[in-house]
Amino acid sequence: MQLNSTEISELIKKRIAQFDVVSEARNTGTIVSVSDGIIRIHGLSDVMQGEMIALPGNRYAMALNLERDSVGAVVMGPYADLAEGMEVQCTGRILEVPVGRGLLGRVVNTLGQPIDGKGEIENDGFSPVEVIAPGVIDRRSVDQPVQTGYKAVDSMVPIGRGQRELIIGDRQTGKTALAIDAIINQRNSGIKCIYVAIGQKASTIANVVRKLEEHGALANTIVVAASASESAALQYLAPYAGCAMGEYFRDRGEDALIVYDDLSKQAVAYRQISLLLRRPPGREAYPGDVFYLHSRLLERASRVNEDYVEKFTKGEVKGKTGSLTALPIIETQAGDVSAFVPTNVISITDGQIFLESNLFNSGIRPAVNPGISVSRVGGSAQTKVIKKLAGGIRTALAQYRELAAFAQFASDLDDATRKQLSHGEKVTELLKQKQFAPLSVAEQAVVLFAVEFGYLDDVELSKIASFETALLDYSNRNHAEFMQELNKTGNYNDEIKDTLKGILDSFKANSAW
């Protein structure tokens, strides 16, 4: 069969008409330098601050410096094989991490990828790591407690749901132990927990995970790990990733607790990135926006009202408030709380628990310094019974510290001073507590009642610990119903006062400790 020229031209025209041309606009650039996890890229004219840049090998970098002729970006992950001349492209997306209940009980890295060898995670979607904190109208005042299980904390520096309470102290003063015990104490409270480990040894993180598992708290906890071997970029972003995972629960009318361990290392990682990006250094070589680094993170911890939750869930959840409580940890050098990062975080948070190495080394653990530890909003969230019974403890300790300093120089002391010193010593002894041994509200109430109403006056200092153990054992064994009811309500009235008095009277009359 022969085709003439007209048929051929018609056929070509038909094919051309059917040919579908899809033009795809891509914003690409070329790597011009790679050093210490920082890449400089030529091109990318439409890139945005914080945008993810796709690199070869299914990796990403985050654009942090937008300059006239180049873009400075930080690589998320290994960068040894990246070379000058490689092509990269914009994604039009910012960093997002998986969120949802499927993450509970798992250990993940900054990007939300599982690192515990337990298989894939079923998530409920993705959330951006950088989110604007809820506004003033969306918030509600803090009026519900978070029980840490520590007598010293719950009585003197109470923490409320939606509060930011800083744990600050030198290395090896029990900061992580306090935070981990607070997480363990939430295993039956319904509060979901997130533990963010920044710049720690992998062995230390593994030990924390093991302890949480041993005490039945891991099923209720998400562990976000950015160990010391991870890049500075992942250490810098880890707290924001953990916060996004916590906000998932807050925005759905639930309560969550997040521990950042610790923000000093995050600030150091951010300083490293900033200096490599040639940003101008300020005090202690930190960049000018290191305050904003922490303020935008900690402001996201809040208690949100019913309207916010209803609006966020599109009417699925009604009449519930949500909260995200933050326990940031800061490590000081030789007790210097006036350094740059500690003062920044103290000014952002709603109070601080100051742990002192002198107290820790002298056997007072938790080593809480009651003089400069404070909770600015927790008082209104404190359980009624604890609030009523703990009023005299801080005063007694403050007077004891003052008198103890004078007593070193005085040879003869009057009876009132001796009595006050003895009482202070006993209160200090009573506030000591072993790790992984949190007390319930009712147990704390019984102990504080004994302090408040003079039941310790005739107990020798060396027998305080055995007195407390025997008292709690007696209360739980013989008055289990009352203890359960007190744990449930947390109330304090004349009837409860009389019952507590009866417990203490019968215990002292019948028990040898």
Curated annotation (Swiss-Prot):
Q: Tell me the domain of life.
A: Bacteria
Topological relation to the membrane, as annotated: Peripheral membrane protein
**EC number, UniProt record:** 7.1.2.2
Q: Which UniProt keywords apply?
A: ATP synthesis, ATP-binding, Cell inner membrane, Cell membrane, CF(1), Hydrogen ion transport, Ion transport, Membrane, Nucleotide-binding, Translocase, Transport
Positions annotated to bind ATP: G169, D170, R171, Q172, T173, G174, K175, T176
Residue(s) at site: Required for activity: S373
Gene Ontology molecular-function annotations: ADP binding; ATP binding; proton-transporting ATP synthase activity, rotational mechanism
Matching InterPro entries: ATP_synth_asu-like_sf, ATP_synth_asu_C, ATP_synth_asu_C_sf, ATP_synth_F1_a_nt-bd_dom, ATP_synth_F1_asu, ATPase_a/bsu_AS, ATPase_F1/V1/A1_a/bsu_N, ATPase_F1/V1/A1_a/bsu_N_sf
Q: CDD domains attached here?
A: ATP-synt_F1_alpha_C, ATP-synt_F1_alpha_N, F1-ATPase_alpha_CD
Which GO CC annotations does the UniProt entry carry? Answer: plasma membrane; proton-transporting ATP synthase complex
Q: Where in the cell is it found?
A: Cell inner membrane
Q: Please list the reactions this protein catalyses.
A: ATP + H2O + 4 H(+)(in) = ADP + phosphate + 5 H(+)(out)
A family per Pfam:
ATP-synt_ab_C
Q: How does it assemble?
A: F-type ATPases have 2 components, CF(1) - the catalytic core - and CF(0) - the membrane proton channel. CF(1) has five subunits: alpha(3), beta(3), gamma(1), delta(1), epsilon(1). CF(0) has three main subunits: a(1), b(2) and c(9-12). The alpha and beta chains form an alternating ring which encloses part of the gamma chain. CF(1) is attached to CF(0) by a central stalk formed by the gamma and epsilon chains, while a peripheral stalk is formed by the delta and b chains.
Functionally, this protein is described as follows: Produces ATP from ADP in the presence of a proton gradient across the membrane. The alpha chain is a regulatory subunit.
Write out the similarity annotation.
Belongs to the ATPase alpha/beta chains family.
Q: What is this protein called?
A: ATP synthase subunit alpha
